[in-house]
């Protein structure tokens, strides 16, 4: 009976412990996102920061790249002006797709306004090491920073609810 009681409490506490692993990350002064677990962080000499998380069951990856465009000599005004041109968004899309390789197919794309920011939303299919992957990405600019938020579905068992929760956790403070 006592063992049964202990096992019962473990089943009650386990979901609570799992929920508490969520980690809110400040990407810029005005942009936050919550990862399902604590991500690995790499800062590359103030040029870029990379946040990455691979789920323990390897069904999905969650990644965010924050690139400081000011380090490329661009000003905030130049970036704001460039965003007004469709060619700017086309270049963001094509450069991201080029990084993924020739096997990449665009499943859907849309430009959406989230908290006053134009966000390019891409859903892609690609192949890596003979395995098919599906990706969803939000690409946008905040001040001098290019932000690319990516979820990679690596296996059929990947939770779409977890993916949607990740993207829905994006907070942009105006």
Language-model region placement:
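Conserved polar/disulfide-associated segments of primarily extracytoplasmic proteins
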Residues: 47-134
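A short, solvent-exposed beta-edge/loop patch
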Residues: 135-145
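Short secondary-structure junctions
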Residues: 23-24, 34-44, 96-112, 171-173
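Sec-dependent signal peptide cleavage junction
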Residues: 18-32, 75-80, 173
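A structural detector for beta-sheet-dominated domains
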Residues: 26-28, 34-36, 42, 54-56, ...
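Stable alpha-helical elements in mature extracytoplasmic
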Residues: 31, 35, 84, 88, ...
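Surface-exposed amphipathic alpha-helical segments
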Residues: 21, 27, 37-39, 143-174
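Bacterial Sec-dependent N-terminal signal peptides
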Residues: 1-23
């Amino acid at each position: 009976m006592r063992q049964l009681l202990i096992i019962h409490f473990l089943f009650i506490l386990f979901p609570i412990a799992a929920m508490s692993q969520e980690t809110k990350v400040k990407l810029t002064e005005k942009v936050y996102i919550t990862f399902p677990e604590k991500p690995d962080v790499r800062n590359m000499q103030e040029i870029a920061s990379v946040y990455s998380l691979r789920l323990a069951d390897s069904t999905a990856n969650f990644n965010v790249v924050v690139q400081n465009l000011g380090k490329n000599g661009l000003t905030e005004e130049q970036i704001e002006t460039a965003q007004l041109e469709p060619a700017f968004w086309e270049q963001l899309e094509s450069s991201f797709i080029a990084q993924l390789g020739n096997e990449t197919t665009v499943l859907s794309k849309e430009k959406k306004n989230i908290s006053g920011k134009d966000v390019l939303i891409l859903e892609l299919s690609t192949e890596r090491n003979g395995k098919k992957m599906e990706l969803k990405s939000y690409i946008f600019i905040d001040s001098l920073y290019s932000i690319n938020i990516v979820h990679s579905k690596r296996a059929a068992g990947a939770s779409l609810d977890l993916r949607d929760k990740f993207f829905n956790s994006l907070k942009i403070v105006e």
